[in-house]
Amino acid sequence: MNVQSPVRPQYRAVFISDTHLGTRGCRTDFLAHFLGRMSCEHLFLVGDIIDGWRLRKSWYWDPAHDEVVRLVLRHARRGTKVTYVPGNHDEMFRAWLPLGLELGGVRLRPEAAHTTATGLRLLVVHGDQFDSVVRCAPYLAVLGDGAYRASLVLNRWFNLARRHLGHPYWSLSAWLKRRVKEAVKAVARFEAALAGEARRRGFDGVVCGHIHHAEMRRVDGVLYLNAGDWVESCTALVEHHDGRLELLDWPALNGFSFLAPRPQAVPQTA
């Protein structure tokens, strides 16, 4: 009798953040494509997965958002250890953290720790706790959120034009953010704060999200890893079975040359 060995998951660990389900900006097409094709032992949802800020203001949830949730739960059912670390946009889940709940096999945690195959100890946090605007002046963060959403509208029209010209998806809003002097300074402060916290607590590195800026580099001797987002860049951080860490640019890896059409929103009552 031949007994087949279980298929080894593609990755040892996968980290995704800032999907912002519940907004029109969420790239559910790219995200579902990724979740449906990868497999992993550990899946970390590093905050701002569901955008409670936007859902409180106006309800938007189409079938593509349901599909993303279904795919995450399918990973949990198939044995993937799924850990959800809420951020500031899904802070409603933080009230449940003291209960240590599991929802559909998804563990809710205020933060997490992950040890790679090579022995690196990584702190996993969303990162809003280290953003001075969110921490000290949350009303400014909300105002900034409005300006950010406006940039995403511009980004979508820009990419529609690129689609008609036969060019691949490219994030204009992310490109602008990397070149605005004050934004660059804010990113540097954020990175230094996260790296400092990881060092203070004895970790070798930190995995975060929050600023929608995928990055993998050393900051003052600490490995700083930002998983990016699924609104602008559509990136994920993965750990291979040999412990190697890699940032995946999903649209670029798959040669997406157009934006998939979006289904019409299903009217919902708030």
Which residues fall in each region the model found?
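A short, compositionally biased domain-edge/stem linker segment
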Residues: M1-S5
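Core catalytic region of metal-dependent phosphoesterases/phosphodiesterases
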Residues: P6-R12, L21-A117
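Residue-level marker for buried hydrophobic side chains located in beta-strands
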Residues: A13-F15, L43-L45, L123, V207
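Active-site glycine-centered loops adjacent to acidic/histidine catalytic or metal-binding residues
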Residues: D18, G47-D48, G87, H126, ...
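Anionic group-transfer/hydrolysis microenvironments
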Residues: T19-H20, I50, D128, P251
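Conserved beta-sheet core of the metallophosphoesterase superfamily
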Residues: G100-P110, L123, D128, S132-V142, ...
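Active-site-proximal loop/helix segment associated with metal-binding centers of metalloenzymes
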Residues: V125-F190
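C-terminal regulatory/interaction regions
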Residues: W250-A270
